């Protein structure tokens, strides 16, 4: 079944089919006569009179009116099998790492979420080894987690650290979707995973900044399809990482504009909620396995009320907000403990001790926040004795939330540390109960456990008891 191109407007192509027209989301193929390569289109609008409008998932250089277009009778499909592990692929599941072609069952990337009766809510905790996360925003296995932050506050570094820790500590499978981010960062991630030996348990799916919007909009679905294969057919618990889900929204905005839709609030596409739902509702735990999704979310102008971050918020189980002011203090990961939250930070899920320590930590930090204006005007000396103790402990908590990361070791010259959840709780419990009040503040900066704090204080000549 062939059609003929009747109009080309950048990545938007109109095609006339004399017989049956393709379905919406059906993939179409044509040969680019200039580049001698295949170009895939995706049907988006049925215009009537045997005409359809499609979006090109590749460069349209050399495409002209009159070229023949073939129907495939199915949506974009990718090969899924265990062969995809350790590989870097594009939106079509084709290798871009110079390796052999991947063999596997061709699976459509556009499909419905699993049946409701197969969904199993999971309340077990995914330990990350990162203190700020494990204490204040524990990740539910099989849940959806968002890393919110503006440009340059450390979202990508934190995602790379999570890949490292989950692969090394849990031996789990990771699927990484690079959506509209820098090619350089993708290359760094690939090299980092190669060097740390975790690449064999991971799949990287890239649709970077230089790709057409149609590609950037479909990369998360390709990554999801691969993750679903490992969950449904191999019974695995999969960590799905998306960097950056906001670029998916941006790509949808570009496609929507090209298709002539009237924009919604702040210029976003009118289908924003539907498009995000198509991705988020497929991230589920089932009776066979789970997909835990960690999504980096760029926050335009650090405004969390922007329609894109606000819509993403509604889908999440844990929200991790990265703060520019905390990053400027040199505390990494720059997690804002007062803005971040987790639905499973309750005694019935994490245990009474964990929930109580986390509550007291937040309480102390909130009290410190309320005292900051007084301190800046009058100084710490004018505070009551009780408030001075609170300030002392709050500063130690702030510094103890920092941690040397494995993926940043090359830049900081400080070896990375994985901190078990029990050690994290033990350390913060000691601070809030006043057991380490006489130790200097700088001993709490960029260390792992309480033992490391005492060792650092001893090295600095502090009194130990």
UniProtKB/Swiss-Prot annotation:
Q: Where does ATP bind?
A: 149-156
Q: How does it sit in the membrane?
A: Peripheral membrane protein
Tell me which GO cellular component terms the UniProt record holds. Answer: plasma membrane; proton-transporting ATP synthase complex
EC number(s): the record gives 7.1.2.2
What's a Gene Ontology MF term here? ATP binding
What keywords tag this UniProt record?
A: ATP synthesis, ATP-binding, Cell inner membrane, Cell membrane, CF(1), Hydrogen ion transport, Ion transport, Membrane, Nucleotide-binding, Translocase, Transport
Question: Which reactions does this protein catalyse?
Answer: ATP + H2O + 4 H(+)(in) = ADP + phosphate + 5 H(+)(out)
Query: Which leading EC class covers this enzyme?
Result: translocase
| Gene3D superfamilies found in the cross-reference section | 2.40.10.170, Bovine Mitochondrial F1-atpase, Atp Synthase Beta Chain, Chain D, domain 3 (1.10.1140.10), P-loop containing nucleotide triphosphate hydrolases (3.40.50.300)
Location(s), subcellular: Cell inner membrane
Is Ion transport included in the keywords of this UniProt record? yes
Q: What does this protein do?
A: Produces ATP from ADP in the presence of a proton gradient across the membrane. The catalytic sites are hosted primarily by the beta subunits.
- Which family does the similarity line name? Belongs to the ATPase alpha/beta chains family.
The record's note on quaternary structure and interaction partners says: F-type ATPases have 2 components, CF(1) - the catalytic core - and CF(0) - the membrane proton channel. CF(1) has five subunits: alpha(3), beta(3), gamma(1), delta(1), epsilon(1). CF(0) has three main subunits: a(1), b(2) and c(9-12). The alpha and beta chains form an alternating ring which encloses part of the gamma chain. CF(1) is attached to CF(0) by a central stalk formed by the gamma and epsilon chains, while a peripheral stalk is formed by the delta and b chains.
- Xref: NCBIfam families: atpD (TIGR01039)
Q: Which PANTHER family match?
A: ATP SYNTHASE (PTHR15184), ATP SYNTHASE SUBUNIT BETA, MITOCHONDRIAL (PTHR15184:SF71)
Q: What is this protein called?
A: ATP synthase subunit beta
Please report the organism this UniProt entry assigns to the protein: Dictyoglomus turgidum (strain DSM 6724 / Z-1310)
What does the organism's lineage look like at the top? Bacteria, Pseudomonadati, Dictyoglomota, Dictyoglomia, Dictyoglomales
